[in-house]
Structure formats: C-alpha cells, structure tokens
Amino acid sequence: MTHYEGDLRPPTARFAIIASRWNARITDVLVAGARQSLAGNGIGEDAIDVIRVPGAWEIPVAANRVAQSGQHGAIIALGCVIRGDTRHYEHVADLCAEGLMSVQLQTGVPVLNGVLAVERVEDAEARAGGSHGNKGEECALAALELVNLMELLP
C-alpha cells in the first residue's frame, strides 16, 4: 500500500492570495497572517501574489482566472462575511464557498477557503489573530501541504 501525504517543505510553486477589501480591518490581518506563514516556511515574497477584490462575492471569479493561468500552485481565498439583518449574508457566504470548490475541482489547483462567515464582528476578530488563531495562517499552511501533496499524487 502506498501512502501519500504532503508536508511543509517550500515548493517551487507560486502562491496567490485573493482577499476582499470589504471588512478590511479583518481581511488585512488574514492576509498578513498568510504572508507571514508562507514566508516562515521558506516562500519568498517574489513567489506570493496578493490580489484584492471588492468583496467575497468577487473572490471566486478572480480565483478562476488565476487558476486557469496555470501560474500558481495554490490559491488562498480570504474574506469576511458578517451576518446582518437580511439573507444577503447567506447568499454571499454559501455561493462564495460553492464557487471556490468549483474552481478547484474544475482546474485541479487547490483553493483554500479562508472566507470567514460569522455572526458578529467579534467572531471575525477571534479568527483574525484573536483567541481562535489566524485563519489566514492556517490556510497558508494547508496550501503549502497541498502543493507538495499534488506533486506526489499519480
């Protein structure tokens, strides 16, 4: 039986971080965490592209373009959707997640979903460097591992 597992060795691949500007107080921290995590694992700044889009709704289309270019080993999607008084939150969060999954399944490029879908701003703060860590950092580590794993898989 063959066992495949990725690790955190720095690959030669480029990484794309696609982040929304909406809720920038949160997303800026997520982006910084992702960049620090990649750099801390041997990925140079010249191998990281940061792409800003207006909001979470626009992340999947940008991810699709980036994935189709074939220039990146993985895409890290970062955003923050906070529940409001209408159902808009549910549409944006759910369809963003579906779009990101569709991109990675159609292109074979790993897309890490770091788009926070939270009830309150305090929940987002907890996941952007607070008591629940930094989801940008976590997505970057998963991206590193997946890039290495994809190189191993037949």
UniProtKB/Swiss-Prot annotation:
Enzyme Commission no: 2.5.1.78
Pathway membership, UniProt: Cofactor biosynthesis; riboflavin biosynthesis; riboflavin from 2-hydroxy-3-oxobutyl phosphate and 5-amino-6-(D-ribitylamino)uracil: step 1/2
Reactions catalysed, as given in the entry: (2S)-2-hydroxy-3-oxobutyl phosphate + 5-amino-6-(D-ribitylamino)uracil = 6,7-dimethyl-8-(1-D-ribityl)lumazine + phosphate + 2 H2O + H(+)
GO biological process: riboflavin biosynthetic process
Gene Ontology MF terms in the entry: 6,7-dimethyl-8-ribityllumazine synthase activity
Record-annotated active site: H88
Protein's UniProt keywords contain Transferase: yes
Disulphide-bonded residues: none
Residues that hold (2S)-2-hydroxy-3-oxobutyl phosphate according to the record: D85, T86, R127
EC category: transferase
Gene Ontology, cellular component aspect: cytosol; riboflavin synthase complex
UniProt keywords, alphabetically: Riboflavin biosynthesis, Transferase
Segments traversing the membrane: none
Residues reported in the UniProt entry to bind 5-amino-6-(D-ribitylamino)uracil: W22, A56, W57, E58, C80, V81, I82, N113
UniProt cross-references to InterPro entries, sorted A to Z: LS, LS/RS, LS/RS_sf
Subunit structure comment from the entry: Forms an icosahedral capsid composed of 60 subunits, arranged as a dodecamer of pentamers.
Family: Belongs to the DMRL synthase family.
Described purpose of this protein according to its UniProt entry: Catalyzes the formation of 6,7-dimethyl-8-ribityllumazine by condensation of 5-amino-6-(D-ribitylamino)uracil with 3,4-dihydroxy-2-butanone 4-phosphate. This is the penultimate step in the biosynthesis of riboflavin.
Stated name of the protein: 6,7-dimethyl-8-ribityllumazine synthase
